[in-house]
């Protein structure tokens, strides 16, 4: 029962996220639901994935540039390996579009 409730909660959370349209609203939303540490972890994960998608830096260079551990980079790399190739290409295109190469 608890797992079903959590799955419904996650789906509802994602649905609510899809309704947010401005960076300011996202900031307020995530400030409500995530601690400072969780937001910092999410920001680090974003930078790691962004750098991995750009394929311009080694893992060691990413670690030095962003002050993250090799283990964090490995987790990001493994997550990218596990996603659908079409979604990965979508992310790469977004990365290029917004000048984050």
From Swiss-Prot:
Compartment list: Cytoplasm
Asked whether the keyword Transcription is assigned, the reply is: yes
Record feature DNA-binding region, as residue ranges: 59-82
Q: Say which domain of life the source belongs to.
A: Bacteria
Question: What keywords are assigned to this protein?
Answer: Cytoplasm, DNA-binding, Repressor, Transcription, Transcription regulation
| InterPro entries per the UniProt record, alphabetical | Trp_repress, Trp_repress_bac, Trp_repressor/repl_initiator, TrpR-like_sf
What is its biological role?
Answer: This protein is an aporepressor. When complexed with L-tryptophan it binds the operator region of the trp operon and prevents the initiation of transcription.
Among NCBIfam families, the record links this protein to: TrpR (TIGR01321)
HAMAP family reported in the protein's UniProt record: Trp_repressor
Quaternary structure annotation from Swiss-Prot or TrEMBL: Homodimer.
Output this protein's name: Trp operon repressor homolog
**Which species expresses this protein natively?**
Chlamydia caviae (strain ATCC VR-813 / DSM 19441 / 03DC25 / GPIC)
């Amino acid at each position: 029962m608890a797992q079903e409730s959590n799955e419904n909660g996650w789906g509802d959370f994602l649905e609510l996220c899809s309704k947010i349209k401005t960076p300011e609203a996202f900031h307020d939303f995530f400030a409500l639901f995530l601690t400072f540490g969780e937001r910092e972890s999410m920001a680090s994960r974003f930078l790691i994935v962004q750098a991995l998608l750009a394929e311009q830096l080694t893992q060691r260079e990413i670690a030095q540039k962003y002050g993250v551990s090799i283990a964090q980079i490995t987790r990001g790399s493994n997550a990218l390996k596990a996603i659908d190739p079409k979604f990965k290409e979508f992310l790469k295109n977004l990365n290029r579009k917004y000048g984050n190469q």
